[in-house]
Amino acid sequence: PTANVSVYASYSNSFTTNTGVDVNGNLLAASIIDQYEVGAKNTFLNGRLTANVAVYRITNSNLAQQAAYLADGTTPNTNSNIKTLSGETTSDGVEVGVNGTLSKNLYFITGYSYNNTRFTHSAGNKGSNIDGEKLVNAPTGTANASLFYVFSSAALKGFKVGASGFYTGSRFGGYNNTVGQAILGSRMVALTGFTTVDLSAGYTYHDISLQCKLSNLFNTLNYLVHDNYSITPIAPRALLVTASYRF
């Protein structure tokens, strides 16, 4: 580490209780989660530019998912409260962020994330997930970029405008495949990546703030959730206005 560079390493171990029951009506064991992470942060140009990078691995020893079959092993399960512990999942990822000030009034924020989440050490019995298969609804890459301008002239002091773009990469919808499944072929559905753009404007006067945002400017159509029982599209173009007062 130097005056402009900082590094860190961390490890955490935690558990998450799982709701629902297994196919025999028993409560589910907790999920044990281990996270390892190392990262670094650096500043350039006398603090006007900041860059950071982090590399991590997250393992979940007991991922709970809706059971594919009931206790007889042949009847499809349609009850989302009946679940199975699918075995271990592992997520390896990298996060990069670059933020900076271009002028007294203009600044930007950017970020990119890569994530590879897949099943590891599954049970191997009928209905269990397949080692190495990526989890559905887990994009490999996401990115964001925002540019903001803050007015400083006497006539416009307190006004701020901005534009932001958000990218969600390709991923799979549907359901993950299981050992011994009856359906032929794959149950996973390939979903394309998509980008949305937001515009924003705000005004602050003492303790009063007014914010206006036009989200999904180009009315992009894609899906947040896509499985056998529901298809949830991303929010369409919308105008959001909020007012707040700070006590």
Task: Specify the residue positions occupied by each region the protein language model found.
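Residues that define the transmembrane beta-barrel architecture of outer-membrane proteins
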Residues: 32-36, 90-92, 139-143, 193-197, ...
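Transmembrane beta-barrel strands of outer-membrane/channel proteins
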Residues: 9-13, 40, 51-57, 110-114, ...
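C-terminal beta-signal and adjacent terminal beta-strands/loops
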Residues: 59, 166-183, 202-247
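Membrane-embedded beta-barrel scaffold of Gram-negative outer-membrane proteins
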Residues: 6-10, 31-101, 108, 113, ...
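Repeated loop/turn-to-beta-strand initiation elements of outer-membrane beta-barrel proteins
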Residues: 4-7, 46-51, 105-108, 154-159, ...
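Gram-negative outer-membrane beta-barrel transporters
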Residues: 84-176, 242-246
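Residue-level signature of outer-membrane beta-barrel architecture
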Residues: 1, 40-44, 100-101, 149-151, ...
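Solvent-exposed loop segments that connect transmembrane elements
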Residues: 19-26, 62-84, 119-136, 172-189
